[in-house]
Amino acid sequence: MCKIIAIANQKGGVGKTTTTSNLGIGLAKHGKKVLLIDADAQGSLTDSLGFTEPDKLEETLATALGNIINDEDMEADYGILKHKEGIDLMPGNIELSGLEVSLVNVMSRELVMRSYIELVKDNYDYILIDCMPSLGMITINAFACADSILIPVQAAYLPAKGLQQLIKTIGKVKRQINPKLEIEGILLTMVDNRTNYARDISNLLIENLSLIHISE
């Protein structure tokens, strides 16, 4: 059975893309079939994996979701790129920004990505979705089709207050759209345990995050 994990935090620069690629490659090295989905209009995951001009790609997540919206036939391997580390990639690019705007007028707009996932999930053990640094419609789509959400948090600032909006959104999606949705965990990133500051921040984060829970 395929497990779908969204890697998300509405704050940029916390290590979402690095977490997605490293986790995916690690799973592949353990013999798992892995698909990475770049659901960020910046195309950072696509670029970081060596596909350095994502905006020139003709088949991407945006065009795949467009096919779903328009009820067009599509093969499960549509747009998927192969990587030397043994992972597959559905690339993302700037076209996702336009798609996010157009989703406003689409029926069942929160479930478009779920339809795409249904098409491809039988080919994989894990699907990892690198989300935009926002809580827009593309990110909501990722939450609507995910089994769980992994939240990278940089251990150099106090994010508990900022995380509350993310946790609130996850809870709303769980209640209204995707009752199976859970938080996979909070991943502290960019931690330098050699400094007292980093250790203090990490401990404070753990204390604060223990008070946050997803609403049923």
Q: Which residue stretches match the model-derived regions?
A:
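P-loop NTP-binding core
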Residues: M1-E216
